UniProtKB/Swiss-Prot annotation:
GO biological process, one term: lipid A biosynthetic process
UniProt protein name: 3-hydroxyacyl-[acyl-carrier-protein] dehydratase FabZ
Enzyme Commission designation: 4.2.1.59
Name of encoding gene: fabZ
Pfam annotation, one family: FabA
The species this protein was found in: Microcystis aeruginosa (strain NIES-843 / IAM M-2473)
Active site, per annotation: H65
Alphabetized SUPFAM superfamilies for the sequence: Thioesterase/thiol ester dehydrase-isomerase
Keywords: Cytoplasm, Lipid A biosynthesis, Lipid biosynthesis, Lipid metabolism, Lyase
HAMAP family the UniProt entry points to: FabZ
Protein family membership: Belongs to the thioester dehydratase family. FabZ subfamily.
Reactions accelerated catalytically: a (3R)-hydroxyacyl-[ACP] = a (2E)-enoyl-[ACP] + H2O
Compartments where found: Cytoplasm
PANTHER family for the chain: 3-HYDROXYACYL-[ACYL-CARRIER-PROTEIN] DEHYDRATASE
Amino acid sequence: MTIVTEALTELEPVIKTTFTVEEIRQLLPHRYPFALVDRIIDYVPGQKAVGLKNVTINEPFFPGHIPNRPLMPGVLIVESMAQVGGVILTQLPGMKGKFFAFAGIDKTRFRRPVVPGDQLIMTVELLSFKMNKIAKMQGEARVDGQLAAQGEMMFSIFD
């Protein structure tokens, strides 16, 4: 390797492909009890992210949903996917520090219950981003490889 090649290699930006919970907290405004992503385990800039949520019996929603058979509410599964989508959006050029609001869901289905002890793996893909204002994404959540939920999500930027 020549000196020039070494210098160019050092100048190439390092593409981040994972995010810790601390890094996610720097990107998203959500806090307990509404921070629903523990880690981003795979990230392709401008395209997709895979996040995980460790579902424990200590989640604040389990005592009321449902007392004798704790289930993670479907709306929180969708919110978890939306937060993974939020990580994708915050990493787009010019979007750092912007606030993205969840603007809608379509074609959402729940396929299996999510219960304490499950690890929810959420894959979210960016389908479109129009005029740097409206984003559309496709998400799915799996537990042990089984589809738990899927749907399309819309986001809007608030300045």
